[in-house]
Amino acid sequence: MQFSSLSLVFLAVIGAIANPIAVDSELENRDVQLSKYGGECNLKTNACRYTKGGKSVFVPCGTAANKRCKSDRHHCEYDEHHKRVDCQTPV
């Protein structure tokens, strides 16, 4: 009787160790969300300017017609996690 109850407890512990709580993926998702920066487009230089840590950072937008800045001071977004800039984001 004791052997069967101990074996059930042992199996439950092994299952908990084998399937850890998905905290790492939640932290990774949070990091991805925190790595997005909003900024403004500069039509003359075709670059997105955003502020990171109190400093202005310039990232060039794409050269294709659907990747360029729409207008001066248009909202743009830089995703530092994926290293992508979106100069066509809707306001």
UniProtKB/Swiss-Prot annotation:
Residues 1-18 form the signal peptide. It comes from the Eukaryota. Disruption phenotype: Does not affect the production of oxopyrrolidines A and B. It is found in: Secreted; Host cytoplasm. The keyword Disulfide bond applies. It holds the Pfam family Antifungal_prot. GO terms for cellular component: extracellular region; host cell cytoplasm. GO terms for biological process: defense response to fungus; killing of cells of another organism. Residues 19-33 form a propeptide. Disulfide bonds join C41-C69, C48-C76, C61-C87. Keywords: Antimicrobial, Disulfide bond, Fungicide, Host cytoplasm, Secreted, Signal. The keyword Disulfide bond applies. InterPro entries: Antifungal-protein_dom_sf, Antifungal_prot. Belongs to the antifungal protein pafB family. Antifungal protein; part of the gene cluster that mediates the biosynthesis of oxopyrrolidines, polyketide-amino acid hybrid compounds with feature structures of tetramic acid. Acts as an inhibitor of growth of various molds and yeasts. This is Antifungal protein opdH. It comes from Penicillium oxalicum (strain 114-2 / CGMCC 5302). The lineage of its organism: Eukaryota, Fungi, Dikarya, Ascomycota, Pezizomycotina. The gene is opdH.
